[in-house]
């Protein structure tokens, strides 16, 4: 009887779960997933009411991946119940290069989209939309895109993996404190209460990556993005139910159609907020809070910006309503917004699977195919190069043309 290869995955978010999903499909692995909390992890970036599912990318690789992922969202039993095909409205005036390149890629790949240049043209596509375009703004609608219930999607995959024999270890037993190493080989991980050994280790630790990895050479930066929710009346819910996802890359503001339980969620995809901390290792890194905050008070600038954009899209009355809930959602940023699927340069068997940079969730159904493909060096060289561990000193977010809004700020 052939012995299974033992694998430890640190991190029970989308990157870790998708890697486990791919390894489970391949067979021959005994998998343990460690996290300080059971999934869906309450403060993970992959856990929330909704996430945008789109193929709209100025990067042709991600555009193609998005089209493939959308097909899985529509048809795969693990995901299709969580997908809402609302369509997406892509608006811009200043950041037109990203918008226009996205539309060009979609067209080349056979995805139809409807362009609009005036509010009247927009409302022919979405009759219930009450927002106005600013002077010079234009955009397009992609009716194949939409959104997904992120939390329920995670639950669906966790249940599947558990039934397939994957072990989930959480609490102090799953809280990783350090690596167990022997020269340039990682033998296992030490947790708060014990240790786990394995032949292969995958670090999919999201916004905690820089604080957990030794000598990470500042490849990753945790940035917090402001998120808020407002409760709609039953009449408003019915009125706005057929609205699309709205995405404005001039401001970074985006907003979803109402959730089935009647909430509007909106946020900013920007340069974010850092939370620099002195770590026991001597490093200074941006790190999310150890204990998740329930409805944290948003920075005043962020609240005003969210309300200003909410007023533009959903009207004055709704924009002045008290927030039902708020959140700081922590991204794992890389300098160029590329994922990192590669071995740590100091350890030959430590595979790092992270760097979502605010756009990883949509690929949940197919992400493991690419991350594990990189782990086994099965992908074509351009993809291996795209997602390699980059040693160049690049300025964070300087190469991510999807970001907008104020410069990065430190949380006070």
Curated annotation (Swiss-Prot):
It is found in: Secreted; Cytoplasm; Nucleus. Its main location: secreted. Dimer. Glycans are attached at residues 105, 142. Keywords: Cytoplasm, FAD, Flavoprotein, Glycoprotein, Nucleus, Oxidoreductase, Secreted, Signal. Residues 1-20 form the signal peptide. It catalyses: L-pipecolate + O2 = L-1-piperideine-6-carboxylate + H2O2 + H(+). One of its GO terms (biological process) is L-lysine catabolic process. Its EC number is 1.5.3.7. The keyword ATP-binding does not apply. This is L-pipecolate oxidase.
